[in-house]
Amino acid sequence: MEGDIAEMGKFIGAGLATIGLGGAGIGVGHVAGNFLAGALRNPSAAPGQMANLFVGIAFAEALGIFSFLIALLLMFAV
């Protein structure tokens, strides 16, 4: 009985840790949307901002990957 409660807690914790994946998707959408809005306003500046776009997407995705790894650790290592 006690082992079942511990397993349940691990799965609930892993599920809560994956909330960050939704945040990563929202973050990537904001970064790409703002880049597109700026590129449409000033097309000549878009190539210069491409590096900033990739850095912003990388930071947003890193948080999602981090929360996914925490969920995996909670499920299989704890």
From Swiss-Prot:
Membrane-related topology note: Multi-pass membrane protein
Site (Reversibly protonated during proton transport): E61
GO cellular component: plasma membrane; proton-transporting ATP synthase complex; proton-transporting two-sector ATPase complex, proton-transporting domain
GO MF annotation terms: lipid binding; proton-transporting ATP synthase activity, rotational mechanism
Keyword entries, A-Z: ATP synthesis, Cell inner membrane, Cell membrane, CF(0), Hydrogen ion transport, Ion transport, Lipid-binding, Membrane, Transmembrane, Transmembrane helix, Transport
Signal peptide: none
Cell membrane listed as a keyword: yes
Subcellular location(s) of the protein: Cell inner membrane
Membrane spanning stretches: 11-31, 53-73
Family the entry assigns: Belongs to the ATPase C chain family.
Described function: F(1)F(0) ATP synthase produces ATP from ADP in the presence of a proton or sodium gradient. F-type ATPases consist of two structural domains, F(1) containing the extramembraneous catalytic core and F(0) containing the membrane proton channel, linked together by a central stalk and a peripheral stalk. During catalysis, ATP synthesis in the catalytic domain of F(1) is coupled via a rotary mechanism of the central stalk subunits to proton translocation.
Subunit and interaction comment: F-type ATPases have 2 components, F(1) - the catalytic core - and F(0) - the membrane proton channel. F(1) has five subunits: alpha(3), beta(3), gamma(1), delta(1), epsilon(1). F(0) has four main subunits: a(1), b(1), b'(1) and c(10-14). The alpha and beta chains form an alternating ring which encloses part of the gamma chain. F(1) is attached to F(0) by a central stalk formed by the gamma and epsilon chains, while a peripheral stalk is formed by the delta, b and b' chains.
Protein name as it appears in the record: ATP synthase subunit c
The encoding gene: atpE
